[in-house]
């Protein structure tokens, strides 16, 4: 027998029914799930292995998988499939979104917590103009600009992807030299022989330091670290969602959820006034389904945000046992999404932005399509600048609402485009005016709306410079002179000065030099989470600023290249230093904290592996054993200690959420 047989009831039938319950037979858990100690649905491949993109292994193949179950993920939600190719979407003249499925099809999820969205919301067959054209535009630029030859295959995004510096861009994966050259950020062959370009790789037999299988394995590990989203590990006995969701529409619970929305100083409270939210609550409690579509979508989105925050309150619930139906509320909002696109309005724009904020907060891939919907509404309403807004709306209050909505969209889009390497939709000319005060601004409080708007401006400047190819070249480009390096260094200096000014104006700017555990211990969970987010936001922007020049070739002194690499390493170390105080609940509350950690981990792992491979090529056993371990950092630790910090962090997080701990561990082993 291949394993224990588990009988699973398809439908719950009352005891007085004459019909017997139907059972279907499933095999036991696969070996991968047993080793990882996660719940397996017994299919081949199972839901956990599909989600984690690992091989699904069973002790025997005598049984055949149930074809009806292989396409199902946790909580009965369809598993997201990776698109094999990109097809041109049917976009509007405004560069909006083409949606090939209904809102109902895109919202089939039954999970009791908001993190089922990570699997189910992404099944919407929608693509933005940015997402659909990003690959082809970057590839065309990359091929035309570099003398790579006609046989080069591009299987990833552009070489100039904004946060993928030093990661292995799979350019002609069979070419081991090309993979390692891109991974290291420098020409590793220079010290051991003649210089080779990416289109002219050396023979694999000539250099025993390169192993094709090993290099492709490294590329897979880093790709997994870059792409995997953290999922909640389901409890064996999860709480069942409430059967009657109407019980959550009473005024007391609505007020509790809205209070949870207000708790985030950078959340929807900067977009919506509390009195407006209370008016929406009154309409819902009095008229229920008689309210207009914009009000209904906005209300259900706010309730989803509030339930999500309440479920993650460490004082009430355990991770994976959500009491409040965040997903059901958001499903109600999704059902009317198409109407908001068909009939754009200022209220509809606010509703879409609220949905986009929630999607970005839980880390769903549909965030880009929500932002595209918002950009489509902005274009349709012709909110192109301050003059257009003032001409369209006579009331000063409406003008402020429109300007605030456009700045909120700008503040959401620019950092995301910088992080994901996307092409932005909102031009800077759309916000040719200073951001208005926060919707709930008080002179006794910090206006985080203005702070985030300022940071978005800096992100936009970094994106412009990167898109203009002014921040460095790839290792294969030849003939860089000192003038180009000087120009890149001057641009970097200007951008970093803007970041430093932004950092110094933060309320807790003095905590950037060192992380003091006593201050984190004395603060609340929300304060600690917010402070760490601001710290890591600054350091990740430093990495993005220096990453282009860090990939350059350290020739003719290469002072600028070495400085950029050192700054990237320092920033990654600072992020990992702060990770001591990041919990699984923090990550599930705001997915950006996980993104900062993965960026820092990729930087540290790549530096360590680059040094290890450089030692292999030179054939110096002394350098191989001591070079990496003895490299001291600005924090007084060897860089290998930060590899240990990363492995320990992912191991700790893996107790509650599904993170690529095995891949991080293997990368650490390769760097030793």
Swiss-Prot record:
Task: Kindly summarize what the UniProt induction comment says about this protein's expression.
Answer: Expression is controlled by the global regulators for secondary metabolite VE1 and LAE1. Expression is increased under histone deacetylase (HDAC)-inhibiting conditions.
Q: Which GO terms describe its cellular component?
A: nucleus
| One Pfam short name | Zn_clus
Question: Which GO terms fall under molecular function for this chain's record?
Answer: DNA binding; DNA-binding transcription factor activity, RNA polymerase II-specific; zinc ion binding
State any GO BP term from the record.
positive regulation of fumonisin biosynthetic process
- Mainly resides where? nucleus
Kindly list the places in or outside the cell where this protein is found, as annotated in its UniProt entry. Nucleus
Q: What happens when the gene is disrupted?
A: Impairs the production of fumonisins. Abolishes expression of FUM8 and FUM19 but expression of FUM17 and FUM18 can still be induced.
Per the record, where are the segments of Polar residues compositional bias? 77-93
Ranges for region Disordered? 65-111, 190-212
Binding region for DNA: 30-56
Keyword list, A-Z: DNA-binding, Metal-binding, Nucleus, Transcription, Transcription regulation
- Which PANTHER family does the entry link to? HALOTOLERANCE PROTEIN 9-RELATED, TRANSCRIPTION FACTOR PDR1
Q: What does this protein do?
A: Transcription factor that regulates the expression of the gene cluster that mediates the biosynthesis of fumonisins B1 (FB1), B2 (FB2), B3 (FB3), and B4 (FB4), which are carcinogenic mycotoxins.
Q: What is this protein called?
A: Fumonisin cluster-specific transcription factor FUM21
Species: Gibberella moniliformis (strain M3125 / FGSC 7600)
